[in-house]
Amino acid sequence: MITGIQITKAANDDLLNSFWLLDSEKGEARCLCAKGGFAEDDVVAVSKLGEIEYREIPVDVKPEVRVEGGQHLNVNVLRRETLLDAVEHPEKYPQLTIRVSGYAVRFNSLTPEQQRDVIARTFTESL
């Protein structure tokens, strides 16, 4: 069970008035904030806090879906040889359009460096 606490008395002055989440099942404490000595999100054994007195604070924990960043996929349906030929003979492919970072762009409008980058990223030997 997770219990929120505010330390009201401690031998270590850095712990005074700090806020923690105690996990009684694991015997661990997660620092929410402290004056010093502990960083936010530090997880330590409860015994490391030493002799303390505390008051419980209400913790409202709701299940939450946490998405770190997003996924993005650009699909270009063509062969590597087609892009390599477009680099060598751009006049043969005036309408060749590809997807780059979510945008449609004419392959011939890219710089040579960008064209090489697209070819390298689009076609790989293995994952």
Curated annotation (Swiss-Prot):
Coiled coil: none annotated. Residues 5-127 form the Glycine radical domain. The keyword Transferase does not apply. Keywords: Organic radical. GO terms for cellular component: cytosol. It comes from the Bacteria. The modification Glycine radical is found at G102. GO terms for molecular function: formate C-acetyltransferase activity. InterPro entries: Auton_GlycylRad_Cofactor, Form_AcTrfase_GR_CS, Gly_radical, Glycyl_radical_cofactor_GrcA. Acts as a radical domain for damaged PFL and possibly other radical proteins. NCBIfam families: spare_glycyl. HAMAP family: GrcA (MF_00806). This is Autonomous glycyl radical cofactor. The gene is grcA.
